[in-house]
Amino acid sequence: MLKHLIETFGCNQPFAISEITYKDYSQIWIYKSVAELCKKGEIVHLDRGVYYIPKKNKYGIVPFDPMKIIEKKYIKDNENVQGFYSGKYLLYQLGISKVQPKTIEIYSNNETQRSKVVNICGKRLLLHKPRTKIDKFNASVLCFLELMNGIDVETLDEYKRKLITDYIAENRITQRQITKYIPYFPDKTCRNLIESEVIYRVPQ
């Protein structure tokens, strides 16, 4: 069973127990096997229904990166895009802010409440229900519009505008996409797009 899990998911990669299939064995047998492997320390229970197989080297156990479970649970599970980072954490990711926030803000299809704080593996998350369903085709433009909705226009200099322009180019965001999704956002978003002059950097 352990060999099968390693071959299927690899080490230090989170996986859901619901993803496990093994020969013709029942889910009850799989649950019992996973519980037994947990007792032996062969796999680690991370969160509800989520586990990982510890990676070992000559120095011992390689630390697990908690961002992997956050990515899998709220951002992207294999090819299924279901969320994006936002707020101060996104500003930090883009280099617009140099201060790493203690809270990671995320919009995700897996959150049904307007706003909720949770802790996962020592990471504090502020989760939001998205304005519309997120998928691989609209995640980038929705992320961009959330960025512009929350941005302080007066703090934007040319360097920061360039960082936003780079994000637009890298994600191939177009004015056509913005026109499609801007109705989901408050008037402030459109106002910030114009006042910051960022809208003029978005291709047709």
Where are these regions (language model features)?
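Short beta-edge/loop segments at beta->alpha junctions of small alpha/beta modules
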Residues: 1-75
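Amphipathic alpha-helical interface surfaces
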Residues: 30, 86-87, 140
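Short gly/ser-rich loop at a beta-strand->alpha-helix junction or flexible surface loop bordering the NTP-binding
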Residues: 46-50, 78-114
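Short, surface-exposed loop/turn motifs that are enriched in glycine and acidic residues
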Residues: 60, 76-80, 134
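Short acidic-hydrophobic surface loop/beta-edge motif
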Residues: 114-120
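A short, charged helix-loop
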Residues: 121-129
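Hydrophobic alpha-helical interaction segments
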Residues: 129-204
